[in-house]
């Protein structure tokens, strides 16, 4: 079957061709005992990064994967795909996130992902992503990020969020607003198809890199938007407090 001509592929053939011709390139460095950590750019301590991971289900055909993105430019700077235990994966994630300027660390919290998250929390990594317990990201949930009873560690992929996550990656690819450099990710994207209305890997192929990339782009948009709204809200609250404080001081001077 010619997937490019079938009309069932999630990502348009012309967009795939654009990315392959414009951005795809070999990594500058292959790291790790298995050589599966591909690095295109080293850390720049003036930048903010996010590390977004998908934990293997544990079967023989599944992989654990993560991407590192420059948050500001949506540029893929590193990528991992390999076979590794959930606990060891947690240690790898803490190490690489710490290396990349204490990056925001996002790990899907479904099923076996909890074992990885528990290891990250045991290592006391401070910049772990939390999701709202009601699965709805709002300014209020962002402002409550330190009230852990209102949040759950990791990213919650659900029947509601999965289509939104994939739609966000489709949008980024269509608008050419993300820089993807990985041949491995491109290969997954070419066999990512619509099947009974659901986007998924073709039989006998994987989508680990796609899902971690899509999650990164979704969280990037959500986190940046909520951070800005939260900052605006905080400034408004501070301004209101300062005005109230000034009025109170004026009243006290009058009374005095």
Label each region the model flagged.
Residues 152-155, 172:
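Structured lumen-facing ectodomains of secretory-pathway proteins
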């Amino acid at each position: 079957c010619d997937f490019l001509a079938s009309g069932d592929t999630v990502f348009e053939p012309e967009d795939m061709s654009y990315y392959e011709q414009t951005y795809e390139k070999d990594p500058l460095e292959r790291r790790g005992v298995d050589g599966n950590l591909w690095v295109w750019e080293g850390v720049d301590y003036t930048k903010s990064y996010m590390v977004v991971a998908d934990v293997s289900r544990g079967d023989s055909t599944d992989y654990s994967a993560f991407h590192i993105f420059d948050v500001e430019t949506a540029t893929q700077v590193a990528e991992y795909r390999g076979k590794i235990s959930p606990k060891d994966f947690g240690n790898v994630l803490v190490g690489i996130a710490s290396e990349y300027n204490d990056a925001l660390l996002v790990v899907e919290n479904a099923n076996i992902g909890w074992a990885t998250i528990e290891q990250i929390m045991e290592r006391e990594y401070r910049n772990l992503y939390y999701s709202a317990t009601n699965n709805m990201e709002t300014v209020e949930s962002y402002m409550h990020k330190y009230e852990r009873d209102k949040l759950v560690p990791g990213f919650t992929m659900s029947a509601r969020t999965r289509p939104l996550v994939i739609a966000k990656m489709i949008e980024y690819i269509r608008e050419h607003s993300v820089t993807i450099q990985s041949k491995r990710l491109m290969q997954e994207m070419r066999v990512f198809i619509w099947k009974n209305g659901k986007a998924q890997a073709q039989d006998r192929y994987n989508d680990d890199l796609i899902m971690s990339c899509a999650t990164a782009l979704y969280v990037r948009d959500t986190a940046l938007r909520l951070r800005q709204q939260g900052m605006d809200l905080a400034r408004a609250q501070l301004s209101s407090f300062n005005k109230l404080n000034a009025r109170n001081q004026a009243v006290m001077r009058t009374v005095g």
